[in-house]
Amino acid sequence: MNTFWKTIAEYNSATWMYQIFIVLIGVFLTLMLLRNPQRWVKIGMKIYFISTYTWISVVYYHIYCSERSYNNVLSIFWAIMAIAWLWDLLAGYTQLERNPKYNVLGYLLVLMPFIYPVFSMARGLSFPGITSPVMPCSVVTFTIGLLLLFSRKSNLFIILLLCHWSLIGLSKTYFFKIPEDFLLASASVPALYLFFKEYYLTDLHKDTKPKAKFINWLLIAVCVGIGIVLTTTLVIELYKDA
């Protein structure tokens, strides 16, 4: 647990200026997407996701979380999601078309990166040892929220990877005493339901790239592989604490 919060403090201390820059770009693109969703804005948002996910993979996990026993597998996981967004950018599948049906949950999740540090400070924590807006769970909640606001024809593979990640957060609430992740895990359940509801109500399962059966097998392979590795590393961490 000490290593977990120590790496977070080191990450925040060294990168807080970069995090502010990343957040400002995200705020700008989100406002532009809501007010004037032109093609260049949509492309810019996808590039932003690719860049931010790569940042989490390389800077957060590979560099600053190198002391953690499971950093490499999570770095790979985020690299996979960055590649998935790159594929989506090139294929043009996710349309980022506005869908006002899920505004309440969507806006709540989009604002969650700012709620995370407030929640940490409410627990008596102080900077730099707090959750920040450019950390994995904050980025995931923001992405899920944005995709809910623009849920017409979304990339199901990316959505399921995001929801899979949010469930991983449940384990961290116990092992690393980080109840902030309950916010992510609890919000992902209704979000996943709404995504599938939209998916089948609009018959998107008939127009999926890659094809539905390939998405299914790919998702199963990725989730099983990551699940096995994470379960093993979490058991190791529990054994160390015993």
Regions found by a protein language model. Name each.
Residues 1-66, 242:
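N-terminal topogenic module of multi-pass integral membrane proteins
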Residues 38-50, 98-106, 150-162:
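Membrane-interfacial loop-to-transmembrane alpha-helix junctions, especially the N-terminal start
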Residues 50-56, 76-85, 141-145, 166-169, ...:
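Alpha-helical transmembrane segments and their membrane-interface exit regions
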Residues 51-59, 109-119, 162-174, 227-233:
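Aromatic-anchored segments of alpha-helical transmembrane domains
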Residues 68-145, 150-151:
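Membrane-proximal helix-loop-helix units in multi-pass membrane proteins
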Residues 70-74, 174-190:
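Loop-to-transmembrane alpha-helix initiation sites
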Residues 200-217:
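Membrane-interfacial, low-structure loops and terminal tails that flank and connect transmembrane helices
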Residues 231-242:
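Juxtamembrane boundary at the C-terminal end of a transmembrane helix
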